[in-house]
From Swiss-Prot:
Pfam families: HGTP_anticodon, tRNA-synt_His. It is found in: Cytoplasm. Its EC number is 6.1.1.21. Homodimer. It comes from the Bacteria. InterPro entries: aa-tRNA-synth_II (IPR006195), aa-tRNA-synth_II/BPL/LPL (IPR045864), Anticodon-bd (IPR004154), Anticodon-bd_dom_sf (IPR036621), His-tRNA-ligase (IPR015807), HisRS-like_core (IPR041715), HisRS/HisZ (IPR004516), HisRS_anticodon (IPR033656). It is an enzyme of class 6 (ligase). GO terms for biological process: histidyl-tRNA aminoacylation. CDD domains: HisRS-like_core (cd00773), HisRS_anticodon (cd00859). This is Histidine--tRNA ligase. SUPFAM superfamilies: Class II aaRS ABD-related, Class II aaRS and biotin synthetases. GO terms for molecular function: ATP binding; histidine-tRNA ligase activity. It comes from Cereibacter sphaeroides (strain ATCC 17023 / DSM 158 / JCM 6121 / CCUG 31486 / LMG 2827 / NBRC 12203 / NCIMB 8253 / ATH 2.4.1.) (Rhodobacter sphaeroides). GO terms for cellular component: cytoplasm.
Length: 494
């Protein structure tokens, strides 16, 4: 007789696109974020925690680099008919908070936020539906000093978590400069911003693909179009060769110094008022960073930074890790970007009708943690707690007292709470917990007022082939007076 479907046991499995985080994954991420938070705190930023759930209306259209930002969320309709969704980033909740509490918050408002976000997108290798973000934003300041501060803070954050100078670079660009270039190229009319909007969209998407398509592919998209390897044709912006040359010149404008780069950009933007304003902003940012000691070894003006230019309205920044790693096929490649941000106006305008400038940065937490592991700054096997074993069930109070003493001394310790019948299983448990030391006291040791400390780390080394001399110089098991338990464990751990 077939079992009733209602009685079928549920499958114990993680939903597609999600993952579970255990022990070291959690502690390493927390340690990294704590270090970043300390930098943000030092810069005067306050923490903000918002609900994981927002109204779909409040989420709005703040997701960068996606043509249809209202799609791809985990949403549902509540009993009142309101549509709710899990937040897909940390910027949209900030927009709502800045509008809702605008009369209570200081202006400018400086906040940082860290936490998971959710996107209902097709999962793939390294692409999950839940991931962590770490943002810092200044809301309410139009000064480019706020942008310079974000760049400096990002540089400090990378260094404090273990990315040394020389292994990263923060690159700065400006959307206004690109707009000036497009004005010179004839695809932006300041008196009629809607004119050539479609062409500008194609230009932005084309230059954003420079790393993947190369100069030839981008030139094709700026012109009539491009046919890919599969034969699919993508329509281009329809720019002439002269117009395309102006755009490509913008992307190749970086020179050896910030001043030389700015001079080249001024040539490209010509008489464009907006373009000249953007160049001036880049010069000011470079000057403000220079007086603080952030030289070109850490932060540079680089017009080749194009990611996010379709979203941001002014300065744009990207942190790129420059050291090499091996990909899944064993080939060397540069690690790449781990953070990005920029200035975006009208953060709360759709809520209040008032224009509010803002600038900020978002760190890809999982990517940065992967970078630290690649550099050997994270991913090391975490040490477990000292395990106090149980030899006599009727002496649990004695064992609990030992655990308490170790904990009060600041040591991580736990009492074995499984079935104590098989002592071998207790040591296997300690090994599984990566415990460095096991504390043992049977009735004989208790009568003599001693405890036995088993050095599990040394024991593993001996099992792996330590020399006889090493074994003799440091025995893997020692007997110490019960009163010296804490000191002896501390010595063994050191």
């Amino acid at each position: 007789m077939a079992k009733d479907k209602a009685s079928r046991r549920p499958r114990a499995e993680t939903p597609k696109g999600f993952r579970d985080y255990f022990g070291a994954d959690v502690t390493e991420r927390k340690a990294m974020l704590d270090a970043v938070a300390e930098v943000y705190h030092r810069y005067g930023f306050d923490p903000l925690e918002t609900s994981a759930v927002e109204t779909v209306e409040a989420l709005g259209k703040f997701l960068p680099d996606v043509d249809r930002p209202n799609e791809g969320v985990f949403g549902w309709q509540d009993e009142d008919g309101d549509w709710l969704a899990l937040r897909y980033d940390l910027t949209a909740p900030l927009a709502r908070v800045a509008a809702q509490f605008r009369n209570d918050l200081p202006s400018p408002y400086r906040r940082y936020a860290m936490g998971p976000v959710w996107r209902n997108e097709k999962p793939g290798p390294g692409r999950f539906r839940q991931f962590y973000q770490c943002d810092a934003d200044t809301v309410g300041s139009a000064s480019v000093a706020a942008d310079a501060e974000i760049c400096a803070m990002l540089s400090d954050a990378l260094e404090v978590v273990g990315i040394p100078r020389g292994d990263y670079i923060v690159r700065v660009n400006n959307r206004k400069v690109l707009n000036g270039v497009m004005e010179v190229a004839g695809v932006l009319d300041p008196s009629d911003p809607a004119k050539f909007e479609a062409e500008r969209g194609i230009v932005l998407r084309a230059i954003d693909k420079i790393d993947r398509l190369g100069e030839t592919g981008v030139r094709a998209l700026l012109g009539s179009g491009r046919k890919d390897e599969s034969g699919d044709f993508t329509k281009g912006a329809g720019l002439s060769d002269e117009q395309a040359e102006v755009v490509m010149g913008f992307m190749a404008a970086r020179r050896d110094t910030g001043a030389a780069t700015a001079a080249r950009l001024r040539e490209l933007v010509g008489a464009s008022t907006l373009g000249c304003e953007g160049v001036q902003e880049l010069e000011t940012i470079a000057e403000l960073l220079d007086v603080q000691g952030y030289g070109p070894d850490r932060i540079v003006v680089d017009p080749s930074v194009v990611r996010g230019l379709g979203y941001y309205t002014g300065p744009v920044f990207e942190a790129e890790l420059t050291f090499e790693i091996l990909d899944e096929k064993g080939r060397k490649r540069q690690f790449g970007s781990v953070a990005g941000g920029g200035r975006y106006d009208d953060l709360v305008k759709r809520f209040t009708g008032q224009s509010v400038p803002a600038t900020g940065v978002s760190i890809g937490v999982d990517r940065l943690l992967a970078a630290l592991r690649a550099k050997g700054r994270a991913g090391a096997e975490a040490q477990g707690p000292v395990v106090v074993t149980v030899m006599d069930r009727d002496r649990m109070g004695d064992y609990m007292a030992m655990v308490g003493e170790l904990r009060r001394a600041g040591l991580r310790a736990e009492l074995y709470l499984g079935n104590p019948k098989n002592f071998g299983n207790q040591l296997k448990y300690a090994d599984a917990r990566k415990s460095p030391v096991a504390v043992i006291q049977g009735s004989d040791e208790a009568a003599r007022g001693v405890v036995v400390l088993k050095d599990l780390v040394l024991g593993a080394q001996i099992a792996a082939g330590a020399s006889l001399e090493e074994w003799k110089s440091r025995p893997a098991q020692v007997e110490v007076p019960r009163a010296d338990l804490v000191r002896a464990v501390q010595d063994m751990l050191s």
